[in-house]
Structures are given as C-alpha cells and as structure tokens.
Amino acid sequence: MTKAAELRQKDVAGLEAEVKSLQKAHFGLRMQKATQQLGNTNTLRTTRRDIARAKTILAEKQAAK
C-alpha cells in the first residue's frame, strides 16, 4: 500500500510512472483471478485504491501548474 505522503513527494513524471506500474500489476492480478491462481483477492482492492490515490495526487499536481 502506497501512502499519500510518499506519493506527494514525487514529481509528475514519477507519479505517471507509478500509475503505469500499478496498472500493470492490477492487470496481472486480474488475470490471475480469472485463471483462479490468485489466493488473496484483497490485493485487487488495495491495488485499485493505490491507483486511484496516485491518480488523485497526479491530478492535484497538474491542476496546480
């Protein structure tokens, strides 16, 4: 789980990279769930919320410019 304070310290490029890596991880988890290989389905929820948290902070930084 990524903390909001950690994300706020990153610049816009770093946040965009973070969102992309989280989206790739979320896609992999969804594929594991579809093939019934995912044991802990709670990771889908936490990854989805991490993506939303990163996108929110990214939007805040872009609006501040």
From Swiss-Prot:
What is an annotated GO biological process for this record, any one? translation
CDD domains according to UniProt: Ribosomal_L29_HIP
The record ties this protein, via SUPFAM superfamilies, to: Ribosomal protein L29 (L29p)
| Domain of life of the organism encoding this protein | Bacteria
Q: Name one GO molecular function term.
A: structural constituent of ribosome
Any GO CC annotation of this UniProt entry: cytosolic large ribosomal subunit
Q: Does the keyword Ribonucleoprotein apply?
A: yes
Identify the InterPro entries for this entry.
Ribosomal_protein_uL29, Ribosomal_uL29, Ribosomal_uL29_CS, Ribosomal_uL29_sf
- Keywords for this entry? Ribonucleoprotein, Ribosomal protein
On whether Chaperone is a keyword of this UniProt record, the answer is: no
The protein's matches in NCBIfam families, at most eight in alphabetical order, are given as: L29 (TIGR00012)
Query: Which family does the similarity line name?
Result: Belongs to the universal ribosomal protein uL29 family.
Entry protein name:
Large ribosomal subunit protein uL29
Organism, by scientific name, is Delftia acidovorans (strain DSM 14801 / SPH-1)
